[in-house]
Amino acid sequence: MGARRATYWAVLDTLVVGYALLPVLWIFSLSLKPTSTVKDGKLIPSTVTFDNYRGIFRGDLFSSALINSIGIGLITTVIAVVLGAMAAYAVARLEFPGKRLLIGAALLITMFPSISLVTPLFNIERAIGLFDTWPGLILPYITFALPLAIYTLSAFFREIPWDLEKAAKMDGATPGQAFRKVIVPLAAPGLVTAAILVFIFAWNDLLLALSLTATKAAITAPVAIANFTGSSQFEEPTGSIAAGAIVITIPIIVFVLIFQRRIVAGLTSGAVKG
């Protein structure tokens, strides 16, 4: 019975992984095909070419967009995780007036669909000079990413024994020192998980980046891919779009592979009570 169940789950896992990987493999295949064979319907290219990859880097638009995506994503991640860690610590450890209000406000932010806020954000940023700038994207990204960071980290902070923090305070540490030198190192898996999730959110966003930017000064990689055009009005830039999609997927895959164990530890924190 045990062997049959193991075989069943192995087959099911294989099917799920195959289902998830098939679109990625198809996009990768498209990125290696010349324009003449893009629509041949074959997964394995009959002719392999790297012209699509060379083409997207031929101009400076995609390179600038990649730099913008990396910079905006990293700054958003650092600020959101730092603020989220402090807020999550307060939610998990402290009792203070307005605690429920803070949690409710975080929930309220997640309830709003981003598209309903595009027009107000556009008008506000045009009025104060933040349109088509890094801060013009970083600020709304932080706003939408903070609830995610708070919920991820608060669950992890609740699992850290109180005794460790009390022992640090008995040794003369201030609450701030106990947080920085005891709680934060122990919460490293949760911090890494929150950082990865926030970075993925900022890296993959298209709606806000498309609405709040206009030039290569601030457009991100997803926007650059959406703006790809063929060499003529009769040519579809399918291969270029596929190549760009593969390029912007690589950093996420690398991050997840490097921090896989910490991500799993962070996401499963609080699932089992010891």
From Swiss-Prot:
Location of the protein in the cell: Cell inner membrane
Membrane topology: Multi-pass membrane protein
Main location: membrane
A biological process from GO: biological process involved in interaction with host
Occurrences of domain ABC transmembrane type-1 (ranges): 66-259
InterPro entries: BP-dep_ABC_trans_perm, MetI-like, MetI-like_sf
UniProt keyword list: Cell inner membrane, Cell membrane, Membrane, Sugar transport, Transmembrane, Transmembrane helix, Transport
Spans traversing the lipid bilayer: 8-28, 70-90, 102-122, 137-157, 182-202, 239-259
Protein's job: Part of the ABC transporter complex LpqY-SugA-SugB-SugC, which is highly specific for uptake of trehalose. Involved in the recycling of extracellular trehalose released from trehalose-containing molecules synthesized by M.tuberculosis. Trehalose uptake is essential for virulence. Probably responsible for the translocation of the substrate across the membrane.
Subunit structure as annotated in this protein's UniProt entry: The complex is composed of two ATP-binding proteins (SugC), two transmembrane proteins (Suga and SugB) and a solute-binding protein (LpqY).
General remark: Was identified as a high-confidence drug target.
Protein name per the record: Trehalose transport system permease protein SugB
Originating species: Mycobacterium tuberculosis (strain ATCC 25618 / H37Rv)
Origin organism lineage: Bacteria, Bacillati, Actinomycetota, Actinomycetes, Mycobacteriales
